[in-house]
Each structure stands twice: as structure tokens, then as C-alpha cells.
Amino acid sequence: MERTAFYFKDISEKNRLTKQRGVTLLEIIIVLGIIGVIAAGVVVLAQRAFTAQDISDIQNNTNSIRTSMAETFQDEGEYPPATATTVTLTKGNIATTDDLAPIVTLNKLGKISPSESFNGISGDAFQIGQALVDSGSGVHKGFVILISGLDQQTCRNLLSQMGNQWDYVGIISAPAGEDESAELNGTELDADKKAGSVLKSLSVAEDITSTDIVSEETCNIGGANNGIVFGSK
């Protein structure tokens, strides 16, 4: 009788321990799940923070470049053209290379630093081209700066924050690392407004609206292949 009682007691104890182990495993799974959710959230927040910082840097850097371009070239008759080799520049050689790109000239003159010369999103040096303020003239009295390698969300974000600070805003296909000098040079700052292509120009005395920015035609080039062309007279 005692042996039987001991037997049942032993089984009961084993069942209790088994249940304890099961609960412990379940708790571990729950904890790991919570950690996974938190980690995923942290990654998303970190990515947003990095993107926000990149956008802030682009704003500051392009403003510095805009001021420096005017100081350097405004009295020279016309602005210089973009070069096809701008995309090959690095922070290590941008201030010493023989390349005639405007961004190189600004570095050599000490107007801007190498760290201000690059788009933090695409990793490319800013491509700067000459532009026509009056499409009926052959003299390039304006210039444009390209921000390349943008996905749709970042492209629209930049438009909302920077678009109305410039005289001209256009959208082109511009993947990271791709030369766009031919398209930039000769940009007409007085071009007609065109949905998804020319959002602002000297011919239209209108600011870019939120409706323009969220239009299906705006920044709709797949992947991170959108480029914004900001122009100044």
C-alpha cells in the first residue's frame, strides 16, 4: 500500500515538474517574441533617424553649395557645366583632382569641405550643372544641383522640406552612381510646370503644394532611382 502511494506520489511529482518545464519554455518563447518585436521597432526607428539626419545634412549642404556657387561664379558671365566624371569623385580626392566639376572648384577655393560635397543617401558627390534662366537665351545664368538615389518616400520628404526654397524643382531618373551631366546641363529654369516632372519653375509663380507632392506621378520611379533637380538663378 505504501509502495502504491509512493508510486502515485512519484508520478504526481514528475507531472508537476513537467508542467513547470512547459510553462518555463512558454515564458521563454513569449519573452523572445517580445524582444523580437522590440528589436524590429528599434531597427525601424534607427533607420528613420538615419534618414532624417541624411535629409537634414542634404538641406544644409545644398544651402552652402548654393551660396558658394553664387559667390564664385555669378560675376563670370555664366555658370560652369557638370562633368561626366563627377560620380567618380571621392572625399579623398575631391579637393585635389584636376576634374573641372563645379563641386571640385568649390572645394579647391575652400568654399565648402569634402564632407559637405556628398549626398549622404546615395554616397555620390553632388552633380552641379549649368541652367538657362531664359530658355530663349543661350547664356547659362543659373545652375542646378542633383540629389540622386532616392526612394519615393525620401524623395517626397525632401520635396516637402526643400522644394519651395528653390527657383526650380524637377524630377528625373537618377540612380546612385549614375552620370546625369547631359540631362542637367541646359536645364530650362523657366520650363512649363508638368506633373511629376517639373513641379516648380520661374514661369509659374506658385509654390509646390502637398497635393503636388503626393500625386501618383511624383517620385514614382521604382526603387531608389528618383532624383530631384533643384535650380537657382
Model-derived features with residue positions:
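N-terminal leader/signal peptides at the extreme start of proteins
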Residues: 1-21
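N-terminal signal-anchor/signal peptide hydrophobic helix marking the start
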Residues: 21-33
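Short, charged/polar micro-motifs that form catalytic or ligand-binding hotspots
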Residues: 28, 48-55, 144-148
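C-terminal juxtamembrane segment of a hydrophobic transmembrane alpha-helix
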Residues: 32-53, 71-73
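N-terminal alpha-helical signal peptides/signal-anchor transmembrane segments
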Residues: 49, 61-80
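Glycine-rich anion/phosphate-binding loop at the beta-strand->alpha-helix junction
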Residues: 58
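Short, glycine/small-hydrophobic-rich surface segments
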Residues: 72-109
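Intrinsically disordered, low-complexity regions enriched in Pro/Ser/Thr/Gly and acidic residues
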Residues: 110-233
